[in-house]
């Protein structure tokens, strides 16, 4: 009899088999499910506190996605040989899981919930993020924690005009789309994607396709819950004090309505603070006992009702616009004098100072991912300091939100970057958000494109982004173009679309409610396209095309090709040759396995010198050609002459002069510069040289020693021997 009460469910999902297990591992967690998809194994655990902390006024959900290096048969490369802080991929996956599950916890549920996902086995062809989302959905569903799930999730590719379910790494190389969608049976809740300039129709079709495929996982989770689910918690939302709500509403509504007639964000925020303080003072003055946290929550609800009702009634939005108008746009290029490329993009009260820097291949980011190492030559970083929203705050390590916004902007731009062959630079773009009132990530896309073009990057097309919002009550809804920060907080959807005049390059959607239909998404996409075209027009006016020359402060890249067999000659013993080249020419030199050499230099003359020296090193000695070089070594039977860098030839004693040479040192000295002709080379690379082939033959010299000469020499040799004998 086993001590485990193990329950297993398996199902076929496209061409993959999915197995879900619970009851054996991590039994003390509120819920734990192991998901195996073709050898990619993920363990998701969830623990919920039975009681909320006193004074808690928000839902404290934490999602931690962790990849274990042993999952891919690796040992961590750090000094301590253990997993350290989360990688960028782990942070992004944590956000990907958090976004669709957060709206499904009931309103007023403020108990702490911690979701931890471990990837413990990885098949490189099966992404762990989809397995993790299914495992989390199942773990929450069996835990008994109040949760209006389960959710399903799927990855969608687009290959040869057809949608592909959960494509692996290999299939994605030929796919025009990488889209992840998550949602319940009834509605889509989250979309994250990048695309190769695809139409709105294709993108919407991918969302619908992925949502339908996700329902297969939802059905399997329902079966798992039926056999292994724990009792649902007996949790009820706190009872509402209607009398107190009416009291606060009476005190606050007029002041809040007046505040939302103010168009400036700073002035409006100040008016809202004063309204809140006034309500608290009035309650104190009347002797009413209250919890300040609850009062603030009530004020937020009143604000939401005011703003939402005004928009649905067709009244102007918070800043006076209608639902389709984009805020005023100002663009300035080449803002910073010594950077490689820069742009200041301002849209209303949202502003991004975006800077592009060009580097060499050595500057590429080397990423040691679980599925394998690779180099990333396009880096995008997004920073948003507290002053951007007029707040006091701490400056510290990069936050999850900043990593997520940077990745979204990168997804939007990467489809329009030139290939490595066209533009071999490593590119880093940094977006500094200097003002923020909604849609700063999309301002980063616009500013990023302009700064890249300012840096001389030949972009395939201008790329612009826009954030859309939604207000929905029953059957009435309004789609909002270019949402403000307040409209984001008070609305039902955050829908970001980036692309070119030809199509969409990135799409991100987060929906806070259920019931968003395909028709609503169609309206949102059509309205987003209209706004995108408007912004693209403004960008094209400011910068019609990329600069034809890169900044004088950026490194210039020059490429050349050598025989791959000559690579070791350029590198030299222990790297001595390549080090000398870089030190003496002031260039960076990168050599690839196929013999492609990239020279990075700030001046053309330095690059030319490096190229000349590499050509010398890699040049082949030609038979019949005359070379001039120093004598490097004197031998008894000849001398070694340096013809090319690292290439010597043998000048035999018989080839030094037409007359007989008794001693090489009588004719040559080390360091002496001589002219020689190449007589022949053999298959081992040995070179035979001649000096006498270049010298005029003495008059009457047949080239053979005369008999008398030969006799005299014999006599001298004989005489010498006799003298020795006599002695």
From Swiss-Prot:
Q: Where is the S1 motif domain?
A: 624-692
GO cellular component: a single term: cytosol
KH domain location is 555-614
Binding sites annotated in the UniProt record for Mg(2+): 488, 494
Which reactions appear under catalytic activity for this entry? RNA(n+1) + phosphate = RNA(n) + a ribonucleoside 5'-diphosphate
Q: Name one Pfam family in it.
A: PNPase
As cofactor, the record names: Mg(2+)
The terms under GO molecular function for this entry are: 3'-5'-RNA exonuclease activity; magnesium ion binding; polyribonucleotide nucleotidyltransferase activity; RNA binding
Its subcellular locations are: Cytoplasm
EC number from the UniProt entry = 2.7.7.8
Q: Which SUPFAM superfamilies does the protein's record reference?
A: Eukaryotic type KH-domain (KH-domain type I) (SSF54791), Nucleic acid-binding proteins (SSF50249), Polynucleotide phosphorylase/guanosine pentaphosphate synthase (PNPase/GPSI), domain 3 (SSF46915), Ribonuclease PH domain 2-like (SSF55666), Ribosomal protein S5 domain 2-like (SSF54211)
Keywords (alphabetical) are: Cytoplasm, Magnesium, Metal-binding, Nucleotidyltransferase, RNA-binding, Transferase
What are the GO BP annotations of this UniProt entry?
A: mRNA catabolic process; RNA processing
Q: Which InterPro entries match?
A: ExoRNase_PH_dom1, ExoRNase_PH_dom2, ExoRNase_PH_dom2_sf, KH_dom, KH_dom_type_1, KH_dom_type_1_sf, NA-bd_OB-fold, PNPase
Recorded hits in PROSITE patterns, A to Z, give: KH_TYPE_1 (PS50084), S1 (PS50126)
> Compositional bias (Basic and acidic residues) at which positions?
707-720
Could you tell me which residues belong to the region Disordered?
691-727
Q: Which residues form a coiled coil?
A: none
PANTHER family, per database record? POLYRIBONUCLEOTIDE NUCLEOTIDYLTRANSFERASE, POLYRIBONUCLEOTIDE NUCLEOTIDYLTRANSFERASE 1, MITOCHONDRIAL
Q: Give the family, as the similarity comment puts it.
A: Belongs to the polyribonucleotide nucleotidyltransferase family.
Q: What does this protein do?
A: Involved in mRNA degradation. Catalyzes the phosphorolysis of single-stranded polyribonucleotides processively in the 3'- to 5'-direction.
Record's protein name? Polyribonucleotide nucleotidyltransferase
Q: Record the organism.
A: Acidovorax sp. (strain JS42)
């Amino acid at each position: 009899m086993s001590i485990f009460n193990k329950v297993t469910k398996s199902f076929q999902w496209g061409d993959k088999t999915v197995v879900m297990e619970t009851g054996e591992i991590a039994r003390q967690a509120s819920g734990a499910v192991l998901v195996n998809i073709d050898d990619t194994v993920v363990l998701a655990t969830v623990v919920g506190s039975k009681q909320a902390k006193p004074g808690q006024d928000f839902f404290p959900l934490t999602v931690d996605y962790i990849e274990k290096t042993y999952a891919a048969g690796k040992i961590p490369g750090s000094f301590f040989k253990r997993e350290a802080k989360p990688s960028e991929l782990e942070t992004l996956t944590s956000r990907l899981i958090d976004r669709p599950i957060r709206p499904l916890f009931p309103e007023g549920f403020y108990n702490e919930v911690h979701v931890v996902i471990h990837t413990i086995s990885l098949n490189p062809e099966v992404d762990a993020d989809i397995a993790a989302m299914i495992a989390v959905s199942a773990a929450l569903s069996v835990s008994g924690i109040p949760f209006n799930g389960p959710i399903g999730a799927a990855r969608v590719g687009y290959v040869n005009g057809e949608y592909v379910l959960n494509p692996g790494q290999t299939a994605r190389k030929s796919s025009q789309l990488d889209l992840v969608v998550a949602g319940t049976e009834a509605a889509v809740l989250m979309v994250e994607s990048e695309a190769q300039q695809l139409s709105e129709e294709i993108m919407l079709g991918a969302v619908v396709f992925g949502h339908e495929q996700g329902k297969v996982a939802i059905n399997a989770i329902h079966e798992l819950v039926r056999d292994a689910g724990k009792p649902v918690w007996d949790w009820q939302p706190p009872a509402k004090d209607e009398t107190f709500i009416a009291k606060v509403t009476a005190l606050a509504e007029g002041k809040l309505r007046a505040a939302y007639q103010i168009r400036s964000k700073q002035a409006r925020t100040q008016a809202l603070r004063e309204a809140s303080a006034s309500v608290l003072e009035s309650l104190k003055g009347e002797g009413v006992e209250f919890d300040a946290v609850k009062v603030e929550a009530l004020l937020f609800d009143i604000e939401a009702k005011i703003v939402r009702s005004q928009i649905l009634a067709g009244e102007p939005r918070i800043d006076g616009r209608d639902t389709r108008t984009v805020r005023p746009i100002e663009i300035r290029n080449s803002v910073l004098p010594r950077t490689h490329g820069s742009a200041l993009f301002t849209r209303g009260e949202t502003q991004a100072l975006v800077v592009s820097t060009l580097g060499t291949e050595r500057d590429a980011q080397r990423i040691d991912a679980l599925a394998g190492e690779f180099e990333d030559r396009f880096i995008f970083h997004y920073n948003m300091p507290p002053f951007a929203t007029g707040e006091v705050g701490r400056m510290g390590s990069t936050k999850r939100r900043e990593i997520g916004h940077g990745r979204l902007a990168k997804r939007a731009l990467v489809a329009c970057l030139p290939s490595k062959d066209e533009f071999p630079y490593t590119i880093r773009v940094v977006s500094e958000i200097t003002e923020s009132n909604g849609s700063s990530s999309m301002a980063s896309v616009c500013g990023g494109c302009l700064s890249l073009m300012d840096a001389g990057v030949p972009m395939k097309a201008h790329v612009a982004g826009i954030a859309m919002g939604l207000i929905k009550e029953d059957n009435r809804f309004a789609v909002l173009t270019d949402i403000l920060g307040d409209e984001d907080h008070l609305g039902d959807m955050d829908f970001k679309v980036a692309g070119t005049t030809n199509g969409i390059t990135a799409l991100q959607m987060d929906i806070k409610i259920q019931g968003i239909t395909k028709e609503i998404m169609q309206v949102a996409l059509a309205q987003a396209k209209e706004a995108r075209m408007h912004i693209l027009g403004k960008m094209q006016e400011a910068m019609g095309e990329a600069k034809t020359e890169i900044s004088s402060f950026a490194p210039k890249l020059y490429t050349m090709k050598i025989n791959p067999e000559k690579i070791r000659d350029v590198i030299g013993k222990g790297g001595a040759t390549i080090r000398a080249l870089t030190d003496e020419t002031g260039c960076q030199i990168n050599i690839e396995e196929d013999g492609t050499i990239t020279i990075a230099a700030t001046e053309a003359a330095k690059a030319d010198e490096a190229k000349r020296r590499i050509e010398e090193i890699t040049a082949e000695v030609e038979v019949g050609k005359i070379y001039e070089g120093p004598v490097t070594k004197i031998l008894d039977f000849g001398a070694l002459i340096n013809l090319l860098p690292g290439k010597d030839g043998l000048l035999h004693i018989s080839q030094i002069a037409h007359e007989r040479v008794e001693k090489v040192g009588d004719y040559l000295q080390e360091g002496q510069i001589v002219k020689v002709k190449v007589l022949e080379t053999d298959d081992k690379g040995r070179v035979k040289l001649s000096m006498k082939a270049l010298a005029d033959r003495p008059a009457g010299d047949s080239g053979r020693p005369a008999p008398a000469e030969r006799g005299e020499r014999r006599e001298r040799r004989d005489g010498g021997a006799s003298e020795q004998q006599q002695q």
